[in-house]
């Protein structure tokens, strides 16, 4: 029986499940369970033979998954980089809904939001790894500049890094989201319309501390192994860095590749067929502003070996 009390509004929910072209008897991977919107809808379309295997690093997501009392469903407390543990060519579809979820943002104790004061944590998996506060305590100005510039696309990254260093020297390590937001606001003097000056820095630190882009690249590569011919890859991203990786990955595996050292050899056959992209409708954006930046890209696995 599929039930639950979640209030998180899953972005592009119906569009993503439609893009998977669900086979009722198929095995599907929900690579980022979150609060289970995609898994629940998938289960409603599967037969008794179908299965959903979910992945998530967040203990709150693992707890939410316990509300799904269904033998066809299982969840692993792992990041989706571990997709390659699944048997080769065993799944009919892989769905990745990237980034941070609304419940994570809205819970001050998780430290993801500059709008709600809380401990400066930002770890998806709070059982392991450094928090943002711990990393900022010892990070060099150069390292902070690189992270904020590369992962936040913040043109004032150097100013922000020096402001953080000055704050550390004068008042000790940063401990809360409010303290970091204030430091960033003091360094970033220009304002982007409708965007808090701390937005890019918070994004950068979250992506870095969770190794989000590296994990995405590994998961995409693993999807080639686990998808069966005709299986679908559906990825929903929320910022340009993620979307660029997904776009380039699909493009790289959707064309024939010739070996310049062997010009007369047959080309390497493409492993994916690109099926385009979709954005949230105006109606969805009006009801859920966080869906505005969402981009869904879809590809189909060919029969070529990974």
From Swiss-Prot:
Reported function: Specifically methylates the N4 position of cytidine in position 1402 (C1402) of 16S rRNA.
- Residues reported in the UniProt entry to bind S-adenosyl-L-methionine: 36-38, 56, 80, 97, 104
Q: Which gene encodes it?
A: rsmH
Q: Which HAMAP family match?
A: 16SrRNA_methyltr_H
| Organism of this sequence | Polaromonas naphthalenivorans (strain CJ2)
GO annotations of cellular component type: cytoplasm
Q: What is the reaction catalyzed?
A: cytidine(1402) in 16S rRNA + S-adenosyl-L-methionine = N(4)-methylcytidine(1402) in 16S rRNA + S-adenosyl-L-homocysteine + H(+)
- Which SUPFAM superfamilies is this protein grouped with? Putative methyltransferase TM0872, insert domain (SSF81799), S-adenosyl-L-methionine-dependent methyltransferases (SSF53335)
The GO terms this record gives for MF are:
rRNA (cytosine-N4-)-methyltransferase activity
By what name is this protein known?
Ribosomal RNA small subunit methyltransferase H
What's an example GO BP annotation here? rRNA base methylation
- Where is it localised? Cytoplasm
């Amino acid at each position: 029986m599929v039930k639950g009390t979640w209030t998180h509004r899953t972005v592009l929910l119906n569009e993503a499940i439609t893009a998977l072209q669900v086979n009722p008897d198929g095995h599907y991977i929900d690579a980022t369970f979150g609060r289970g919107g995609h898994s629940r809808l998938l289960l409603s379309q599967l037969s008794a033979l179908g299965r959903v295997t979910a992945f998530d690093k967040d203990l709150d997501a693992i707890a939410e998954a316990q509300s799904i009392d269904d033998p066809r469903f299982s969840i692993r407390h792992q990041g989706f980089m571990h997709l390659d543990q699944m048997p080769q060519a065993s799944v009919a579809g892989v769905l990745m809904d990237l980034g941070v979820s609304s419940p994570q943002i809205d819970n001050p104790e998780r430290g993801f939001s500059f709008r709600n004061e809380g401990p400066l944590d930002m770890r998806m998996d709070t059982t392991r790894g450094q928090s943002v506060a711990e990393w900022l305590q010892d990070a060099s100005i150069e390292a902070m500049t690189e992270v904020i510039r590369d992962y936040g696309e913040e043109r004032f990254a150097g100013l922000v890094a020096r402001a953080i260093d000055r704050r550390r020297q004068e008042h000790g390590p940063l401990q809360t989201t409010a303290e970091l937001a204030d430091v960033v606001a003091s360094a970033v003097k220009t304002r982007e319309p409708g965007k808090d000056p701390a937005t890019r820095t918070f994004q950068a630190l979250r992506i870095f501390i969770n190794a989000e882009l590296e994990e995405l690249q590994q998961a995409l590569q693993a999807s080639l192994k686990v998808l069966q011919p005709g299986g679908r890859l559906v990825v929903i991203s929320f910022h340009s860095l993620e979307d660029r990786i997904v776009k380039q990955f699909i493009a790289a595996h959707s064309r024939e590749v010739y070996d310049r050292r062997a010009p007369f050899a047959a080309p390497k056959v493409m492993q994916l067929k690109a099926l385009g992209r979709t954005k949230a409708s105006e109606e969805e954006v009006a009801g859920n502003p966080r869906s505005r930046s969402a981009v869904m890209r879809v590809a189909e696995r060919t029969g070529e070996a990974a």
